[in-house]
């Protein structure tokens, strides 16, 4: 623990950023208002859905902030109407929202300045050592075949708001800003208890989206920094000859190495790689820890994680919630995929002179599939099929035009194929495609009071092209010269689209009714 504290202290920002005076500048709140208007997500604008920015109200807010008893009255009377002890609900709502958004912009400044590191600096800031979430795909493709055990951990959240403030003290040395942050958090939660209900978190996140997102990202950054430290401590030097670079895994390494030239007849270069015993990757609120060590090594890691989380984050983690799975004997779920690393056996016949040998070869293979039961359950909940997967019509869409009905069904099908394009087995996806296609045909037939066969004969190829997915177009270009290629075959090529991390449990593609 002392070693981690020393490592963390070394990575802290040494500069003193005094950002509190910026809260008294009018242009800060203009920036906050401009951010809300131009944001990618629909949010409520200042002043109870009033999209007009009032410079006069901002000036009044700054004048009130200069008063000596401004914050004292707000803290001592938290049960009065909204924030800032104002009798008018409109002014109180406006002041609360605009002050929160302005503070969120101000508190982000030390983190933005830390990213602009000087070229002569040797130490890299710790947030630049963290991995991109897109690294999960090469991690699964390149690393998993060489690992033995896996642990699926959910990042503990929510935690006490005081822990979030203490984490920000690593890079924000401005004490008044931290006190102001405590004031905001004290207003939206019970300060003397651990947050176990999501009511206060939801209220705070809804009214302070930028500030709540900043706090959560800071917390996840510290949690991942802790995993990065543990990963570095578990690394070992492994001797690797230059001849082994024929393996693909060594080409994709992004770790520091050094070469030592030994004098001799052949003058061969020997490389030393920092080979970590523990690998991790994070996505959403989950962390995957995988190791090539033994089961005893994994159990020690599990105990260490539980104790460290309790000490550093003051959060109790139940040990039974961290499950240890052997990759070759179990499946695991991530991002809506069901994955496994089975061992396939191949019988190879070799001939040496006049003798024949049968060699039993065992190879690992990384398989990803789309889980059929949850996806069919989602389609059933959206009233596209029954619980057993039998397609039915969707009466609520019969008032739409034929083109809108085709477009909606085709869009859902393309989104499903796009999200699960990384599956090595497409059987489940083609089953979902059949359900959506027949449900679309029955919906159109019900609208025109006709039979399904008659309507499909009338549409012909137009109906089929609407369900021709983007992934199949890619494969048609790849295998244009193949004569006997079928899209409904068992091809196992995977295409990972990096934008699928923005889709949460396939809710968006299915809620079109």
Curated annotation (Swiss-Prot):
GO terms for biological process: mRNA processing; RNA splicing; tRNA processing. The keyword 4Fe-4S does not apply. Pfam families: Intron_maturas2, MatK_N. One of its GO terms (molecular function) is RNA binding. It comes from the Eukaryota. It is found in: Plastid, Chloroplast. PANTHER family: MATURASE K (PTHR34811:SF1). Usually encoded in the trnK tRNA gene intron. Probably assists in splicing its own and other chloroplast group II introns. This is Maturase K. It comes from Astrebla lappacea. The lineage of its organism: Eukaryota, Viridiplantae, Streptophyta, Embryophyta, Tracheophyta.
């Amino acid at each position: 623990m002392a070693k981690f504290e020393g490592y963390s202290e070394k990575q802290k920002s040494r500069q003193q950023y005094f950002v509190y005076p910026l809260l008294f500048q009018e242009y800060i709140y203009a920036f906050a208002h401009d951010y809300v208007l131009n944001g990618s997500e629909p949010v409520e604008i200042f002043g109870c859905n009033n999209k007009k920015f009032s410079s006069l109200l901002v000036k009044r807010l700054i004048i009130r902030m200069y008063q000596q008893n401004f914050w004292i009255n707000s803290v001592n009377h938290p049960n009065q109407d909204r924030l800032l002890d104002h009798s008018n609900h409109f002014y109180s709502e406006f002041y609360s929202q605009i002050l929160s958004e302005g503070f969120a912009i101000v508190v982000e400044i030390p983190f933005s300045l830390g990213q602009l590191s000087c070229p002569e600096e040797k130490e890299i800031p710790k947030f630049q050592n963290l991995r991109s979430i897109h690294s999960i795909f090469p991690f699964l493709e390149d690393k998993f075949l060489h690992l033995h055990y896996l642990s699926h951990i959910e990042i503990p959240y929510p935690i006490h708001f005081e822990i979030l403030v203490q984490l920000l003290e690593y890079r924000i040395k401005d004490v008044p800003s931290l006190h102001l942050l405590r004031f905001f958090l004290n207003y939206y939660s019970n300060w003397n208890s651990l947050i176990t209900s999501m009511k206060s978190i939801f209220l705070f996140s809804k009214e302070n989206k930028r500030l709540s997102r900043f706090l959560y990202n800071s917390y996840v950054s510290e949690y991942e920094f802790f995993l990065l430290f543990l990963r570095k401590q578990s690394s070992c030097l492994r001797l690797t000859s230059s001849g082994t670079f024929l393996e693909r895994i060594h080409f994709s390494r992004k770790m520091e190495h050094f070469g030592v030239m030994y004098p001799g007849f052949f003058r061969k270069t020997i490389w030393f790689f920092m080979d970590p015993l523990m690998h991790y990757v994070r996505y959403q609120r989950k962390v995957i820890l995988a190791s090539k060590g033994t089961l005893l090594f994994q159990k020690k890691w599990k105990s260490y994680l539980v104790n460290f989380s309790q000490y550093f984050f003051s959060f109790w983690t139940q040990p039974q919630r961290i499950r240890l799975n052997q990759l070759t004997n179990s499946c695991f779920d991530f991002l809506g995929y069901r994955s496994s690393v089975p061992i396939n056996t191949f019988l190879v016949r070799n001939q040496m002179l006049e003798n024949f040998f049968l060699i039993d070869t065992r190879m690992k293979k990384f398989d990803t599939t789309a889980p059929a039961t949850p996806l069919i359950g989602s389609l059933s909940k959206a009233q596209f099929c029954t619980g057993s997967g039998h397609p039915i019509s969707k009466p609520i869409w019969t008032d739409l035009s034929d083109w809108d009905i085709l477009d909606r069904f085709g869009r859902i099908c393309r989104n499903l194929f796009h999200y699960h394009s990384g599956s090595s087995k497409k059987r489940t996806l083609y089953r979902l495609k059949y359900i959506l296609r027949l449900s679309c045909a029955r919906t159109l037939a019900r609208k025109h009071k006709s039979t399904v066969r008659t309507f499909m004969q009338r549409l012909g190829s137009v109906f089929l092209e609407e369900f021709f997915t983007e992934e199949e177009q890619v494969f048609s270009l790849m295998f244009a010269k193949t004569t006997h290629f079928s899209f409904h075959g068992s091809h196992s090529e995977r295409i990972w689209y990096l934008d699928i991390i923005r889709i949460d449990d396939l809710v968006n593609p299915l809620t079109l009714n």
